[in-house]
């Protein structure tokens, strides 16, 4: 396994992943529907996740696109960021969205989390991701979701890397095999005071 810097870990996850997403209430009971997420919908579901890390004139850029594969209505969501002083700073996602960071927990461990948790936006929506590389082409992600300052549910994701090339759509991408990879929506209103639930 490579070193444990943020860039090392981002590179470790580069590729196309097939994720199976399940949800649980705080007591561990399995959920059949996620009513609290940015995009409410059925559970479990499956998605393709394209993860790319590239150097742009000496600046390390991160790009990710999630594409629903089955279990929910078709949907694509893209987001990205830039490594600054060794830490991934995500592009702001929309009105009142906090600064999100990608930080390292050591080799094979990434955490996507707000830079600060003391703003009013955190009281409305807060969902840190804990991502772990299991070796080979396997990974897990755990997302805890808080709404109104209260824990609501936990997502558990089990992923298998199906391609090492995130620059091309895989053949079974619901959007079709041709076209740009990172063409999903990039804004969200879940942090806004008036927040229609429309984004994941």
Regions found by a protein language model. Name each.
Residues 2-3, 7-200:
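Soluble ligand-binding/transfer domains with enclosed cavities or grooves
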